[in-house]
Amino acid sequence: MKLCVLTIATLLVTATSLETQKEIAEGNELTREETPSLVEHKEDEAAAASEKRSCIEEWKTCENSCECCGSSTICSSTWAEGKEIKLCKNEGGTFKKVLHFIQKGISKLKSCKEGN
């Protein structure tokens, strides 16, 4: 009798563990299916970072144009290396305008002192 109960208990444990393994395997399949979308998401992030770098590089060459980052956006003017350039406003243009205003003020003070 004890042997019979032990055999039945072993069969139940085995059947349960097989079901658990099947659920785990199905979960792994779902994970594998999600992986391509995760890869696409990472590729999107890399493309966005590349576009942002491109825009920053473009600030230097974006003279007299409000087309930064490949699309027409609101720009602000600023000065860099002695010449006026346009910056994408959403990429920190306001900060650079304030910085330019301070630099321009200091430059005027220096030229006044040198002139007198």
UniProtKB/Swiss-Prot annotation:
Belongs to the neurotoxin 03 (Tx2) family. 02 subfamily. It comes from Chilobrachys guangxiensis (Chinese earth tiger tarantula). The presence of a 'disulfide through disulfide knot' structurally defines this protein as a knottin. It is found in: Secreted. Probable ion channel inhibitor. The lineage of its organism: Eukaryota, Metazoa, Ecdysozoa, Arthropoda, Chelicerata. Residues 1-17 form the signal peptide. GO terms for cellular component: extracellular region. It comes from the Eukaryota. Residues 25-45 are annotated as: Disordered. Disulfide bonds join 55-69, 62-75, 66-112, 68-88. One of its GO terms (molecular function) is ion channel regulator activity. Expressed by the venom gland. This is U30-theraphotoxin-Cg1b. Keywords: Disulfide bond, Ion channel impairing toxin, Knottin, Secreted, Signal, Toxin.
